[in-house]
């Protein structure tokens, strides 16, 4: 790796950088974007991290490619696949024509497998919805009951944090302890600016940075180049035709749990200065998102699960990104800006049939594979180590927990690791 490029002048230069057929720059960008949920990185702040990730990622790619060339391998399994330490494994498998599966948390407490692709592949997920519904052993009546539970128990934000038990008679869903979400308190109240005589539209934007972490699958922005551009253009043009519309932009409550303010929040805050008919609902607000959508005249979303949750509740939903939910028949799927405006300005717009919403709910609860011997301790959160193997708690050994981990955080050892990394750069 002596010829590996380590310094970059711009984000685009880094994202386009490749090692043979491996998009190493994009995978490094994806990992660093996770640090502070940034979609527009200032590379000057991450020079060391960029170099460290590039070196490590290149070593994994070349080493694993060499491993596959010397050993017959049937299948490779790995987690997620978009980060700098996982993507090189996928690149090695593709170069060696070896079958691979990525795995990710499933809604139902199990895990999902993705054959020769990643969890971010929304085309793969969309095709799986109908397959899971069609291949189910349950009657349509029971499938509808299971799919409806996803919405009736507000499980949209509980991904990977429920335990599901289904038998011939009963369906039991238990929400696991979830330290982050359990801190969020909500109230069923509407904002002071909510006027019943107005056309009240609730907008659920998604995190921008996620669109930059798996660029090969982020091909769903067919109408607008960014969410903030879409919001400004839609509100500006709506106001040219009507003074009856009021937009409530609900920033995701989990933003309040991050250690830094999400990068795009400043842009959202400026909307209230630019437009008089906008109310920004902050992440830390106690306004219940479900109560907002239940009272809305219309709901807008890009790729948020809130879109399909509102569709189940028989609300007219307009999806703006060509993502999984956009393709379901329970939501409106405009193809251009004029179609978006016509839907927003239509005072008689009706909700669509929610059968596809039910299929989506069923898919979320039933697509995950439940392990045979592993389950969750319902009284423990992920952060507390919720794993039970054959009913025995899975914990690090005393040596790891009491000696290795504390020592690894000491400054002297950190300096040693930094020195070793420098040697690696020179090799």
Map each language-model feature to its residues.
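Conserved N-terminal ligand/cofactor-binding loop architecture of enzyme catalytic domains
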Residues: 1-58, 105-181, 374, 378-391, ...
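Conserved nucleotide-sugar donor-interacting segment of glycosyltransferase catalytic cores
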Residues: 60-116
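Structural alpha-helical scaffold elements that stabilize or flank donor/cofactor-binding regions
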Residues: 67-69, 194, 291-295
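A donor-sugar binding/catalytic signature common to diverse glycosyltransferases
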Residues: 85, 111, 284-332
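Hydrophobic beta-strand scaffold residues
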Residues: 98-107, 247, 280, 317
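Conserved catalytic-core segment of nucleotide-activated headgroup transferases in glycan assembly
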Residues: 160-269
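Nucleotide-activated donor-binding/catalytic signature segment of Leloir-type glycosyltransferases, i.e.
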Residues: 265-283
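Nucleotide-sugar donor-binding patch of glycosyltransferase catalytic domains
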Residues: 316-362, 366
């Amino acid at each position: 790796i002596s010829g590996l490029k380590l310094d970059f002048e711009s984000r685009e230069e880094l994202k386009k950088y490749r090692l043979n057929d491996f998009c190493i720059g994009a995978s490094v960008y994806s990992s660093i974007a996770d640090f502070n949920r940034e979609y527009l990185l200032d590379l000057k702040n991450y020079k060391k991290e960029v170099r460290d990730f590039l070196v490590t990622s290149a070593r994994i790619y070349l080493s694993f490619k060499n491993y596959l060339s010397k050993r017959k391998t049937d299948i490779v399994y790995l987690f997620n696949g978009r980060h700098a330490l996982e993507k090189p494994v996928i690149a090695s498998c593709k170069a060696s024509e070896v079958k691979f599966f990525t795995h990710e948390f499933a809604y139902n407490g199990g895990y999902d497998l993705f054959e020769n692709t990643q969890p971010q592949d929304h085309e793969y997920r969309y095709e799986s919805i109908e397959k899971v519904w069609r291949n189910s052993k349950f009657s349509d009546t029971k499938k509808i009951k299971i799919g409806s539970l996803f919405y009736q128990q507000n499980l949209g934000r509980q991904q990977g944090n429920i335990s599901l038990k289904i038998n011939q008679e009963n369906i039991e869903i238990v929400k696991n302890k979830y330290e982050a979400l359990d801190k969020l308190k909500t109230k069923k109240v509407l904002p002071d600016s909510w006027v019943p005589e107005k056309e009240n539209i609730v907008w659920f934007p998604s995190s921008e940075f996620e669109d930059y972490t798996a660029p090969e699958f982020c091909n769903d922005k067919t109408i607008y180049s960014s969410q903030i551009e879409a919001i400004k253009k839609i509100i500006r043009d709506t106001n040219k035709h009507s003074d009856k519309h009021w937009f409530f932009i609900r920033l995701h409550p989990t933003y309040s749990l991050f250690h830094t303010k999400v990068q795009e929040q400043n842009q959202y805050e400026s909307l209230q200065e630019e437009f008089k008919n906008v109310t920004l609902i902050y992440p830390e607000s106690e306004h219940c998102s479900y109560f907002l959508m239940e009272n809305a005249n219309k709901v807008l979303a890009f790729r948020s699960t809130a879109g399909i949750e509102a569709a189940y509740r028989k609300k007219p939903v307009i999806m703006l990104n060509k993502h999984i939910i956009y393709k379901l028949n329970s939501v409106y799927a405009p193809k251009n800006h004029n179609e978006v405006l016509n839907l927003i300005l239509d005072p008689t717009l009706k909700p669509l049939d929610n059968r596809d919403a039910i299929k989506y709910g069923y898919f979320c609860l039933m697509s995950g594979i439940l392990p045979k011997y592993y389950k969750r301790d319902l009284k423990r959160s992920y952060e507390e180590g919720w794993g039970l193997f054959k009913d025995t708690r899975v914990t690090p050994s005393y040596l790891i927990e009491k000696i290795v981990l504390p020592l690894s955080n000491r400054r002297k050892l950190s300096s040693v690791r930094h020195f070793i990394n420098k040697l690696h750069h020179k090799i």
